Regions:
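Soluble catalytic domains of enzymes that build or remodel membrane lipids, polysaccharides, and related
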Residues: 160-408
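C-terminal segment of N-terminal export signals and the immediately downstream linker at the start
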Residues: 102-105, 135-168, 180-184, 188-191
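Detector for methionine-enriched segments
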Residues: 8, 68-69, 74, 125, ...
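A short, flexible N-terminal coil/short beta segment enriched in small residues
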Residues: 116, 123-126, 133-156, 254-272, ...
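Hydrophobic alpha-helical segments with strong N-terminal bias
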Residues: 69, 136-138, 158, 306, ...
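Arginine residue identity/basic-tract feature
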Residues: 10, 31, 63-66, 70, ...
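Non-catalytic terminal accessory segments
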Residues: 1-146
């Protein structure tokens, strides 16, 4: 969100020119389809209001603003009102290029190269596709972010102690509590977690967007999560509150301490480059947790060596690390055999195709390991699609995830 604001501030006139170009074509499409002046006037008024809001937000952006509400409104308007127009313009632009090209090479005269019915058909096609995309983004905001899905994964470990056969672990990630106005709307998701009857619940970071107070209203709700052997958590990049300004380093540190305390009140034991031992019938399972480690500019506070101190080499180890790049750059190259790493961070970009045989999201071009289970050099990584939302306050195609692992 910060990056989006900076880009728009620095390239304001270029972006404004692109928007003007879009609107010229859109107005042509509307004029092709209707002679009703009230429709044209209404569209112009709405457009001016939306662009006026954008201009105001970009010019008044400040890192002192801790709320994501205004940013969410801006992103939603962009996705619902502006992005779909690209489809309309694409259809009309192709028609214009075809007509201009035919004229330039002498195939037709301008008067014979204009087909109003073709123009009308292309306008309808563009408006139709744009309308569908807008409807999907609206649905994602209204319903999609609450369609939590349980994904079941069976994990086979060659040296798993017998006492842990059938052991059930639930992973959730990226709650981003500040993106939700009403905790009660997430009650069904908490019920889904408890219905899995987990032995252990692991949270892999980003409980908030910016500040600890976002999570305070959610403490009673997340306290309802039940797990026989406890609930553990690690920090994500957003938990450090790097995306808002602070009066002093002490104030920023106090915010982090407050967040950790709030998560403790909700029943989560925060692992900061350390481990915990789960023991059953004299046999052990080791749960490791590191602080966030990602490629710059993300924090690199994770210390795997510290988390491994005192852990037997032969032990089955499950690592919580928020950012999946930590797996590729550190974990899989580490001499210790960390059997399974659990991450989040990508959200699946909250948009894409997430079908059984077709998986695509724009985020895969930044994070090749963006969702599901991966294996590399004998070690496993699972990337959770996230529990909440950030920026765009919805989900299209990539649903919020609760992962249930059964050890075998």
């Amino acid at each position: 969100v910060l990056f989006l604001h900076l880009v728009m501030q620095r390239n304001f006139f270029i972006i404004a020119a692109v928007f003007i170009f879009l609107e010229i074509y859109i107005y042509q499409a509307i004029r092709t389809l209707t002679d009703n002046n009230w429709i044209k006037i209404g569209y112009c008024i709405i457009s001016l209001a939306v662009y006026g809001f954008f201009a105001y937000e970009v010019s008044h952006f400040s890192r002192a603003d801790r709320s994501m509400m205004r940013a969410q409104i801006m992103i939603s308007l962009f996705l619902i009102f502006i992005l779909p127009k690209v489809f309309i313009v694409l259809f009309l632009l192709i028609d214009d290029i075809f007509r201009t090209g035919s004229y330039l090479i002498g195939l037709t005269r301008p008067s014979k190269n204009f087909f109003p019915e073709r123009r009308k058909f292309l306008s309808i096609m563009g408006l139709g596709l744009g309308g569908v995309l807008s409807a999907l983004f609206i649905d994602g905001i209204t319903f999609g972010k609450y369609r939590h899905k349980v994904r079941r994964v069976r994990m086979n470990f060659a040296n798993l102690p017998k006492s842990f056969k059938g052991y059930k672990i639930v992973q959730i990630s990226d709650v981003h509590s500040g993106s939700f106005a009403d905790p009660e709307k997430l009650q069904h998701a908490i019920d889904l977690i408890n219905e899995q009857n987990p032995d252990l619940v692991l949270f892999t970071g980003d409980m908030v967007n910016n500040v600890a107070e976002e999570f305070k209203p959610f403490i009673p709700l997340f306290s309802k999560i039940k797990a026989k052997d406890g609930k553990f958590a690690v920090l994500g990049n957003h938990d450090y509150a790097d995306y808002v300004s602070w009066d002093s380093p002490e104030a920023k540190k106090k915010n982090l301490d407050t967040l950790i305390d709030y998560e403790r009140q909700a029943g989560f034991d925060m692992l900061r480059n350390e481990h915990r031992i789960i023991e059953k019938n004299g046999e052990q399972l080791y749960i490791l947790g590191v602080e966030n480690w990602g490629l710059k500019p993300f924090p690199q506070f994770g210390r795997l060596d510290d988390a491994l101190k005192g852990v037997p080499e032969s032990a089955v180890k499950i690592l919580m690390s928020h950012d999946p790049t930590h797996f590729d750059y550190v974990v899989k190259k580490h001499p210790a055999n960390v059997h399974l790493t659990l991450s989040g961070h990508t959200h699946g970009m909250q948009f894409g195709l997430d079908l059984k045989n077709i998986k695509w999201s724009p985020v895969q071009y930044k994070y090749p390991k963006w969702a599901d289970l991966y294996e590399s050099e004998g070690k496993m990584l699972y990337v959770n699609r996230g529990f909440g939302v950030l920026g765009y306050p919805g989900r299209v195609g990539v649903l919020p995830e609760i992962t249930l692992f059964e050890l075998a």
